[in-house]
Amino acid sequence: IGKVAAATTTTVLLTEMACQQIIFTGVAGGLGADVRVGDVVVADALLQHDMDASPLFPRYELPGLGVSRLHPPADLTARVVGAVREALSPHALSVNGPLRDVHLATLGLSQPRVHQGLIASGDQFVSAAADCDTLRHHLPGVLAVEMEGAAVAQVCHDFGVPYVVLRTISDRADESAHIDF
């Protein structure tokens, strides 16, 4: 868990295992108004919400890179979004027949959806409504918050390796996040 661990692991995958691309998955807290527990968010941009080297650099800017948001390759992102949409389609999920709806209802979930947008990463487990409001205020349009994706993106960017980050929403990053997670 955390940006350093994710960056270290990604570096090993790229240098020792010669991975040609990285598809990074996991869970995140949902921040977007329409993002629900069980939904999947595929990043079209990643940002370290706890990066602040001001006054030397603007808040969120990655020193040495001159950018605050990292963008996965659009073609790879589009392929992953398509694959997730297919996997979450009612037809694909109907493999379990009527039991699928029972399982979703038991967990208090509805039909999962896929979203595409900004994922914010930081070395903290966000579990307070006030922190969510702060993130939404400073990062309009942010869909999810987690602890590793932007670090993986930065390492892949530095090595010139294509990547995509997708997260299943496990909680709403609020006061019950530690239970829902």
Segments predicted by a language model, with ranges:
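Mid-sequence, gly/pro-rich, charge-dense loop/helix-turn segments that line enzyme active sites
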Residues: L31-L139
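N-terminal short beta-loop-beta anion/metal-coordinating cradle
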Residues: I1-A18, Q48
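Short gly/pro/ser/thr-enriched loop/turn and capping motifs at secondary-structure boundaries
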Residues: K3, G30-L31, Q48-D50, R172-D174
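Short glycine-rich, acidic/polar surface loops and turns
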Residues: E146-P162
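Proline-aspartate-enriched helix->loop->beta-strand connector
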Residues: C19-I23
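Short loop/turn motifs at secondary-structure junctions
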Residues: A18, R36, H115, G141, ...
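Regulatory input/activation interfaces that engage signals or partners
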Residues: F159, Y163, I169-F181
